[in-house]
Amino acid sequence: MILHAQAKHGKPGLPWLVFLHGFSGDCHEWQEVGEAFADYSRLYVDLPGHGGSAAISVDGFDDVTDLLRKTLVSYNILDFWLVGYSLGGRVAMMAACQGLTGLCGVIVEGGHPGLQNAEQRAERQRSDRQWAQRFCTEPLTAVFADWYQQPVFASLNDDQRRELVVLRSNNNGATLAAMLEATSLAVQPDLRANLSARTFAFYYLCGERDSKFRALAAELAADCHVIPRAGHNAHRENPAGVIASLAQILRF
C-alpha cells in the first residue's frame, strides 16, 4: 500500500520536492508554492485519513513513515527534500530522524518538535480525544468553526476563518479523528535531541505573527526563516514569502 499523491516532473538531475500538508489539508495545499519550482520534480502527498488517502488508517508515526517510504520508492524518488507544514512537518521530522535513504534535507513550517513532559502529553491526549470525538459525531462546519478559534490561529481574520471552515469541511470526520489520535503530539517523542544530532540539512519556517512557533524554533538547531505578514499557516497567508525562503534554501 502507498499513499495517494500527485507527481509533477521537472528537469532531470535535481532532487525532488516532497510536500506534506497539515491536518485536514490535502495534496493541493502546497501547490501554489510548489509550482513556483517547476525545475524540480514535485510530489504532493495525501497523508493517511486525508484526500485520496482517506481510506488508509495508521496506528502511529511508524506506520506513516513506512507508507511514506514505500510511496517514495514507488515513484522511484532517490534524492529529495521533505517540505512539511504543521502535521506534515511533524511527519517529516519523525521520518527523517528514523532515516530515509536519499534525503537531502527537511524544511518544516510550523511543526512541533515534541512535548517535553508527561503532564503536557496527558493534557494534549485529553484535548485531542475531545476533538476526535467531535470530528466523529458533529457537523464538520461546526467543529472547524471552533477549531480555527484556537490561539495558534489568532492571526486569521473572520473572512479567512470562514474560507478555511468551508474548505476543511469537505473532509471525512471519522478518518480525520483517527489520524488526529494516531499522530497526536501526545504520542510523538520529543525530537530536539535527534534533530540536534541530525546528519541532514534542517530548515524551519514560521510566520512572524506565530509567537508560539517562533519560540519553538528558537529551541531547535535549525536555520530559521521568519515569514513576514503571516501567522501559523504561512504558506497560505503569504505564499510569496514562503517561496522566497524556499528559493534561498534551495539556491533556486
From Swiss-Prot:
Any one Gene Ontology biological process term? Answer: menaquinone biosynthetic process
For this chain, one GO molecular function annotation is: 2-succinyl-6-hydroxy-2,4-cyclohexadiene-1-carboxylate synthase activity
Q: In which pathway does it act?
A: Quinol/quinone metabolism; 1,4-dihydroxy-2-naphthoate biosynthesis; 1,4-dihydroxy-2-naphthoate from chorismate: step 3/7; Quinol/quinone metabolism; menaquinone biosynthesis
| Reactions it catalyzes | 5-enolpyruvoyl-6-hydroxy-2-succinyl-cyclohex-3-ene-1-carboxylate = (1R,6R)-6-hydroxy-2-succinyl-cyclohexa-2,4-diene-1-carboxylate + pyruvate
InterPro entries in the cross-refs = AB_hydrolase_1, AB_hydrolase_fold, SHCHC_synthase_MenH
Question: Which Gene3D superfamilies does the record match to this protein?
Answer: alpha/beta hydrolase
Q: Do you know which SUPFAM superfamilies this protein is assigned to?
A: alpha/beta-Hydrolases
The record's keywords, sorted A to Z, are: Lyase, Menaquinone biosynthesis
Q: What is its EC number?
A: 4.2.99.20
Pfam families this protein is in?
A: Abhydrolase_6
The broad enzyme category this protein falls into is lyase
Protein purpose = Catalyzes a proton abstraction reaction that results in 2,5-elimination of pyruvate from 2-succinyl-5-enolpyruvyl-6-hydroxy-3-cyclohexene-1-carboxylate (SEPHCHC) and the formation of 2-succinyl-6-hydroxy-2,4-cyclohexadiene-1-carboxylate (SHCHC).
Assembly notes: Monomer.
Family listed = Belongs to the AB hydrolase superfamily. MenH family.
Q: What is this protein's record name?
A: 2-succinyl-6-hydroxy-2,4-cyclohexadiene-1-carboxylate synthase
Species source reads Escherichia coli O9:H4 (strain HS)
The gene behind this protein is menH
